[in-house]
């Protein structure tokens, strides 16, 4: 990506997206592009409603996220009831600490059980299993700290609202 001005992402002869490297990384058009270009957590959801350029998306684990709707994207005309996915890059997730009771879940947060902690130098990768029927896993990258959770802890994380991106399944 460092040597390209524009990239075409294709799968089985079908063009999924054409654009600048940063655009494709930050705003993938499809779940395939999100997974193919860098690491991404792609979570299935259903649009519950829309208010202007923001859509409320309910994930399988019950979490409600609000995602910006880009009128120029393939999902620019997304409507309530539509099945979509959201792309969350590992670096766009913030660790909030121990998760409160499920009934106290704040909008825009995800809860998961820590399955992996990997020190990579200046950062740590943390793997989570979300509490949904699909066994969805999530990967996040945070700056190294002495205050890390332990494997088995149930934690809350919050995606940066500006970096929640809807993609076509």
Question: Which residue ranges define each predicted feature?
Answer:
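Internal alpha/beta loop-helix hairpins
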Residues: 1-63
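Non-catalytic connector elements of ABC transporters
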Residues: 40, 49-169
